[in-house]
């Protein structure tokens, strides 16, 4: 059976996983930026991560005949530090021209905090400024329904965003 992996965090996987996916019929991989299990402490850490997503992972996937696509963002779990978030949002445009970048994501909320909401709004603004697709992340920790409503409201309230370009 042929399929596309819509949400694979391949930076944390081995090449054996790429091989198994290819043998199982995978035709392409889409990898959203995600939390690494710990908070990155600097913009340089994110720069290196974005290089991994836009340069290294496409080469690893290509060894098994798989196109690799990615989404870029600062994950909601790392959005509490507004200074760091601003710095990270500032470098994302450098990577948008990479041929494997699909858009901004996975963005959203985790604890539904004010800082997360502010960074979500900044992500949506960045996507609008650069006409990028948006991939949404719904909350894990707090009220999922409330968080999802907040996310939808942010997207709906930005008239530059076409809802058909949001996943």
PLM-predicted stretches and their roles:
Residues 1-167:
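Mid-domain alpha/beta scaffold segments of enzyme catalytic cores
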